[in-house]
């Protein structure tokens, strides 16, 4: 499994929508990039300028919402993931 470093988080990307609410099948270039996923790994956290560790706000298993254009897409062992900085996470779904 991938292990993020620093304040990075690895998110399992939720599948893209294949159809609209009305049932129309979307072409690949018309699909919206997902903005929701499940946290599968969390880094150790960032360090403040005084050297103190800043704890992470998210944990493995959290479902998070993130900005559509943030992070780096990676594929590992056939699965799609997104590597994000914690600051790019907008909310945790409860």
UniProtKB/Swiss-Prot annotation:
Presence of keyword Kinase: no
Keywords (A to Z) from UniProt: Chaperone, Cytoplasm
Xref: PROSITE patterns: CHAPERONINS_CPN10 (PS00681)
Gene3D superfamilies: GroES chaperonin (2.30.33.40)
GO process terms (BP): chaperone cofactor-dependent protein refolding
Listed CDD domains: cpn10 (cd00320)
Localisation per UniProt entry: Cytoplasm
Subunit structure as annotated in this protein's UniProt entry: Heptamer of 7 subunits arranged in a ring. Interacts with the chaperonin GroEL.
Its job: Together with the chaperonin GroEL, plays an essential role in assisting protein folding. The GroEL-GroES system forms a nano-cage that allows encapsulation of the non-native substrate proteins and provides a physical environment optimized to promote and accelerate protein folding. GroES binds to the apical surface of the GroEL ring, thereby capping the opening of the GroEL channel.
Similarity annotation: Belongs to the GroES chaperonin family.
Matches recorded under HAMAP family: CH10
NCBIfam families in the cross-refs: PRK00364.2-2 (NF001531), PRK00364.2-4 (NF001533), PRK00364.2-5 (NF001534)
Protein name: Co-chaperonin GroES
Organism: Lactobacillus helveticus (strain DPC 4571)
Gene (UniProt): groES
């Amino acid at each position: 499994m991938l292990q993020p470093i620093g304040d990075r988080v690895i998110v399992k990307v939720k599948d893209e929508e294949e159809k609209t609410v009305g049932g129309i099948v979307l072409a690949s270039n018309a699909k919206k990039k997902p903005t929701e996923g499940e946290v599968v790994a969390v880094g150790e956290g960032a360090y403040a300028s005084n050297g103190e560790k800043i704890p992470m706000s998210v944990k493995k298993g959290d479902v998070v919402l993130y900005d559509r254009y943030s992070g780096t897409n990676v594929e590992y062992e056939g699965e799609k993931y997104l590597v994000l900085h914690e600051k790019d996470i907008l909310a945790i779904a409860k």
